Amino acid sequence: MNWHVLAQLTVLAFVIAVGPITLIWLSNKKDALL
């Protein structure tokens, strides 16, 4: 497998995993600030 493809898949998986967590964290922060 090309390492560029592997890197893209890793980044994609990372974004999919961290995205929702970041959104939840940001919404919690917003609620705390307000």
Swiss-Prot record:
Superkingdom is: Eukaryota
Q: Which UniProt keywords apply?
A: Chloroplast, Membrane, Photosynthesis, Photosystem II, Plastid, Thylakoid, Transmembrane, Transmembrane helix
TM segment ranges: 5-25
Q: Which GO terms describe its biological process?
A: photosynthesis
Query: Matching Pfam families, A to Z?
Result: PSII_Ycf12 (PF05969)
| Membrane topology qualifier | Single-pass membrane protein
Keyword Iron tagged: no
Q: Which GO terms describe its cellular component?
A: chloroplast thylakoid membrane; photosystem II
Question: Mainly localized where?
Answer: plastid
Tell where it localizes: Plastid, Chloroplast thylakoid membrane
Which InterPro entries is this protein grouped with?
Answer: PSII_Ycf12_core-subunit (IPR010284)
Subunit structure, per the record? Answer: PSII is composed of 1 copy each of membrane proteins PsbA, PsbB, PsbC, PsbD, PsbE, PsbF, PsbH, PsbI, PsbJ, PsbK, PsbL, PsbM, PsbT, PsbX, PsbY, PsbZ, Psb30/Ycf12, peripheral proteins of the oxygen-evolving complex and a large number of cofactors. It forms dimeric complexes.
Similarity comment: family membership? Belongs to the Psb30/Ycf12 family.
Question: What does the function comment of this entry state?
Answer: A core subunit of photosystem II (PSII), probably helps stabilize the reaction center.
Please report the name of this protein according to its UniProt entry: Photosystem II reaction center protein Psb30
What is the originating organism of this protein? Cyanidioschyzon merolae (strain NIES-3377 / 10D)
Phylogenetic placement of the source organism: Eukaryota, Rhodophyta, Bangiophyceae, Cyanidiales, Cyanidiaceae
Write the gene name: psb30
